[in-house]
Amino acid sequence: MDRLEVFQNELALIAEPEIRELTEFALKSAEAKFFVAPASSSGKYHTVDSRTVGTMEGLNNIIVPGGLVHHTKDVVKLAHEGIPKLFCADDLMIAEKSAIICASILHDITKYGIPCRIHTIAEHGELAARWLEKIAEDKLSALGEHWSTVPNIIIEGIALHMGRWAPSKNKPTLETTGLIHEADYWASRKFIKIER
């Protein structure tokens, strides 16, 4: 599996091509550790399968996903199927739904820092948002020309996905980014099992 194949099902949920392109670009640009690292470096948080370590094998770097990928898939599933229904947010525009899936896929993309470290870093949400703004400034600007709220949903959704548990303690200000925060919270609970 390559980087995009790992998230093939999740990328298919992004109905807007420009938002899917941004997400794919970010996945291709991410540190390799994102694809093979456990979701929790301490083992204190997340489900058992989210604490696994994956590998990159062979000359073609075939990916056997780690726990962070499993956690990310769980967040996407909750953000797409569960959390919007719980909060009566089924009336979102297609672009907003696509932005939520994009942010859900990318929310932990720099969880181990840039360059990667041994342990996760507390401010990884803010770091991921700044990283995406830096590497994809032109793509985010183009999205803003079509949909004024989409770049904010993506950037705030990534930056504030931890809410009060982040060092900044800043909570999401938009309903849409609150959905990402809720999905991440519930996906990280040890007692929750999400079918993939």
What do the predicted segments below correspond to?
Residues 1-116:
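Acidic/His-rich, divalent-metal-binding segments that scaffold phosphate/diphosphate chemistry
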Residues 55-64, 70-71, 82-196:
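Divalent metal-dependent catalytic cores for phosphoryl transfer on phosphate-bearing substrates
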